[in-house]
């Protein structure tokens, strides 16, 4: 039996992806990331200080926070006020780890970049959309810092994107929506850089197990999607050639 995708996409086809840059007024970097029906607002703020463990090192830092609006899902959920759920903590750590791989912290200097990812509407893939859109917002923020003379050179030495993949009817599918995410027997979140090096892989079998061959199929599927996302990011960042200093 072959899985029929609810939106008619092919197995290795992404949902439509759009980055609306300069979406808010005050944050140096802000992007509304739309991935199908998933919508995540990514902003980047700058503080002229670093955590205590970096004070005097000459190096900067990047951290991330992730939240969902109560009405982002079909059934309203309570706001996380006094204590974050384990899921929220895991996701914001993933976002931070992933985007730190894009930066030269010596070039950033002793300042902290905070990436805020706020899910406005969730149809699965919120963490991968937050990483992919968060990178665009990060580039926008760095562009602003260079224009203002805060930075002498760009610290953007890497490019990062992320996508979900899963097994449905024993076959690999790219960029799962909510219906597919629930039905998948195996699902992965894959983060890669510009050279398709793996930054992080989160994966689990919901039912039974999966083979090494299927694992390779899932990674190949993710690689196909990330190549497209990397291009979309570059097209959304107006001064990409000036900002990116990596290889």
Curated annotation (Swiss-Prot):
InterPro entries: ExoRNase_PH_dom1 (IPR001247), ExoRNase_PH_dom2 (IPR015847), ExoRNase_PH_dom2_sf (IPR036345), PNPase/RNase_PH_dom_sf (IPR027408), Ribosomal_Su5_D2-typ_SF (IPR020568), RNase_PH (IPR050080), RNase_PH_bac-type (IPR002381), RNase_PH_CS (IPR018336). It holds the Pfam family RNase_PH_C. Disulfide bonds: none annotated. One of its GO terms (biological process) is rRNA catabolic process. Keywords: Nucleotidyltransferase, RNA-binding, rRNA processing, Transferase, tRNA processing, tRNA-binding. Phosphate binds at residues 87, 125-127. It comes from the Bacteria. GO terms for molecular function: 3'-5'-RNA exonuclease activity; tRNA binding; tRNA nucleotidyltransferase activity. It is an enzyme of class 2 (transferase). It catalyses: tRNA(n+1) + phosphate = tRNA(n) + a ribonucleoside 5'-diphosphate. Its EC number is 2.7.7.56. Belongs to the RNase PH family. NCBIfam families: RNasePH. Homohexameric ring arranged as a trimer of dimers. Phosphorolytic 3'-5' exoribonuclease that plays an important role in tRNA 3'-end maturation. Removes nucleotide residues following the 3'-CCA terminus of tRNAs; can also add nucleotides to the ends of RNA molecules by using nucleoside diphosphates as substrates, but this may not be physiologically important. Probably plays a role in initiation of 16S rRNA degradation (leading to ribosome degradation) during starvation. HAMAP family: RNase_PH. This is Ribonuclease PH. It comes from Nostoc sp. (strain PCC 7120 / SAG 25.82 / UTEX 2576).
């Amino acid at each position: 039996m072959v899985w029929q995708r609810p939106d008619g996409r092919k197995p290795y086809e992404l949902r439509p992806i759009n980055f609306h840059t300069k979406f808010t007024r005050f944050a140096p970097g802000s992007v509304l990331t739309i991935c199908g029906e998933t919508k995540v607002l990514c902003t980047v703020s700058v503080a002229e200080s670093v955590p205590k463990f970096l004070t005097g090192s000459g190096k900067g830092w990047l951290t991330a926070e992730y939240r969902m609006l109560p009405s982002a899902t079909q059934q309203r959920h309570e706001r996380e006020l006094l204590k974050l759920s384990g899921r929220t903590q895991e996701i914001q750590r993933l976002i931070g780890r992933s985007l730190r791989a894009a930066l030269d912290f010596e070039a950033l200097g002793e300042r902290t970049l905070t990436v805020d990812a706020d899910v406005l509407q969730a149809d699965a893939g919120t963490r991968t959309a937050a990483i992919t859109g968060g990178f665009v917002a990060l580039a926008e923020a760095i562009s602003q810092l260079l224009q203002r003379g805060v930075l002498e050179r760009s610290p953007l030495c890497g490019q990062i994107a992320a996508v979900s993949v899963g097994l449905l009817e024993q076959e690999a599918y790219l960029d799962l929506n909510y219906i597919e995410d629930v039905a998948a027997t195996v699902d992965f979140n894959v983060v890669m850089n510009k050279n398709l090096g793996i930054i992080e892989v989160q994966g689990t079998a919901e039912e039974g197990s999966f083979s090494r061959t299927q694992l390779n199929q899932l990674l190949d599927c993710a690689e196909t999607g990330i190549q497209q996302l990397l291009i979309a990011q570059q097209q959304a960042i107006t001064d990409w050639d000036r900002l990116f200093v990596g290889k």
